[in-house]
Amino acid sequence: MRQGRSATPTLLIVDAQSVKNADTAGFKGYDAGKKVSGIKRHIAVDTQGLPHAIAVTTAEVTDRKGALLALQRCKPALCKVQALLCDSGYVGKPFAQGVKDILGEHVSVQIAKRSELHTFKVMPQRWVVERSFAWLEKNRRLWKNCERLLNTSLQFIHLAFLALLLKRF
C-alpha cells in the first residue's frame, strides 16, 4: 500500500461502541453497562485505524459475542492476523478460544488493562480504535441509529470508512 505496509494486518485492535436509537429505529436493545438503548458497533482495526472486521448488533449483545461475529464475517481476509489487542471487556477463555477457532491456533489475545480504575489514561495502541470511532462520528447519519435494519446501519458504516479512504489516498 501507499504507506509501505502490507494490506493484510498481523495485529488487530478490537472494540465496541454503543449508539443510541432514534425514534425511527427498528431494532432496539439495552446495554446495561453503559445504560444505552440502541445498537452496538463492533470493529477490528489495524494499527492505521482502518477497519478489517465490522459487525452491528442490538445493544444487549456482549462485546465478546459481537467481536466474534465481526471476525467470523471477515474470516477470509484475516488469514495473517497473529494477535488481537482488546480491552477488559473481552476477558475470558471462551472468547480466546472462539478467536482461535475462527482465525487459527496461532492467534493470541492480548488484554490491555488499566492500572488505576477511576483515572483517565490513554492506553498504548488502544487509542487507534477510539480514533476510528471518532471518524465515524463525523458523519451526521451515524450519530444516532435511525435505520430500521441492522444491515442498513452496517452499510452506512462501510460507506463512511470508504469516504475516509477516498479522502486519505
Please describe what each predicted stretch is:
Residues 15, 43, 49, 67, ...:
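Mobile genetic element proteins and their domesticated derivatives, centered on retroelements
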Residues 31-34:
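Short Gly/Pro-enriched turn/cap motifs at secondary-structure boundaries
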Residues 38-42:
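Short glycine-rich loop/turn motifs
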Residues 55-76:
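Active-site beta-loop-alpha junctions of metal-dependent nucleic acid enzymes
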Residues 60, 79-153:
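Helix-centered, glycine/charged polyanion-binding patches within enzymatic domains
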Residues 156-169:
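Charged phosphate-binding loop/patch that engages nucleotide di/tri-phosphates or the phosphate backbone
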